[in-house]
Swiss-Prot record:
Leading EC class: transferase
Localization of this protein: Cytoplasm
Disulfide bonds: none
Any GO BP: rRNA base methylation
Record-given protein name: Ribosomal RNA large subunit methyltransferase F
Length: 309
């Protein structure tokens, strides 16, 4: 088996896509499969409908999600990379749980999106319970439709709309709630122009015309915010301090490694007791997430004994 370099050992996507098996799970994919120049089956990754149908097939084949769709223009996430975040998060929780992967974790997904991808993967792989949040009504409606269309998911995944676009945890984490972890794929760009420039680069890399549609889509709240990635995560760090005793691990993806020093400084100023960086890779693409806790070692161990075992 040709393993994709860098993926987590438990990631289900190490080998090349088996298009025969995927098409059996999702017959609609067959219309998009074509031979590559080397004669291997593939799809046109510049075709948004082909990419979306591939995701439908991957979710059906590997994660038991029989009904999945997103509205046009919303982010269509690469499933292997999203799964990696979940698996590395499981390892982080296991480190404080005697090495045992937790089956009882409760996770808060900031920016669940129309695709609901992290809850779908995390619930299937580990049986975790999720609360997904988003500022977009349309994203919440789409995620809710996915949950309702797949039996059993409504017992494991609940959704909350963030009614204050400038807030992250405020208004979402209730007074008597606790979460074992939060996760987030934050907006990367700091303006609409920067987001469009990024999409233009993506189109050039795919050999697309300048006026062609986006490959993976993305709404404003998914792609950019004032202050960009650093601004968003810095606010997240500041708000996390308000919920220091209600969350074991706060985590977020960090797309740009150069942003880490600023974020570490913000974490120090916020009084984070423990900060961890988890490196991830998918082929040539490098990524990472940072995690922080306001609980000391003894408090984290007690938390795990009470909630994760």
């Amino acid at each position: 088996m040709n393993r994709k370099p860098g993926l987590h050992p438990r990631n289900r996507h190490h080998s090349r896509y088996d298009f025969d098996a995927l098409t059996e799970s999702c017959p609609a994919l067959g219309a998009f499969v074509r031979p590559s120049p080397a004669g291997e089956p593939t799809i046109d990754f510049a075709d948004p409908q082909a990419v979306k149908t591939l995701n439908q097939a991957l979710l059906a084949h590997f994660y038991g999600v029989r009904e999945w769709d997103i509205p046009d223009g919303f982010l269509c996430p690469p499933v292997p990379g999203r799964a990696d975040y979940i698996h590395h998060l499981a390892d982080l929780l296991a480190e404080g749980n005697g090495g045992a992967l937790p089956a009882q974790a409760s996770v808060l997904d900031i920016g669940v999106g129309a695709n609901c991808i992290y809850p779908l993967i995390g619930q299937h792989e580990y049986g975790w319970r999720f609360t997904g949040t988003d500022t977009s009504d349309e994203a919440i409606r789409s995620a809710s439709a996915i949950i309702d269309a797949n039996p059993g998911l409504n017992r494991a995944i609940r959704l909350r709309r963030q009614k204050s676009p400038g807030a992250i945890f405020n208004g979402i984490i209730h007074k008597n709630e606790s979460y074992d972890a939060t996760l987030c794929n934050p907006p990367f760009h700091d303006s609409a122009d920067a987001a469009e420039a990024g999409n233009a680069r993506k189109r050039r890399n795919l050999g697309l015309a300048a006026d062609s549609g986006l490959n993976f889509g993305g709404q404003q709240q998914e792609l950019w915010c004032e202050g960009g990635e650093v601004g968003f995560i810095t606010q997240m760090i500041a708000e996390s301090k308000l919920f220091a005793r209600q969350v074991l691990w706060f985590t977020t993806l960090v797309s740009k490694g150069d942003n880490l020093p600023l974020l570490y400084r913000a974490l120090e100023q916020a009084g984070a007791v423990k900060v961890v960086k988890k490196e991830m890779a998918q082929g040539q693409k490098q990524s990472r997430f940072i995690a922080w806790s306001f609980l000391d070692t003894a408090q984290r161990e007690r938390w795990a004994q009470n909630r994760l075992r």
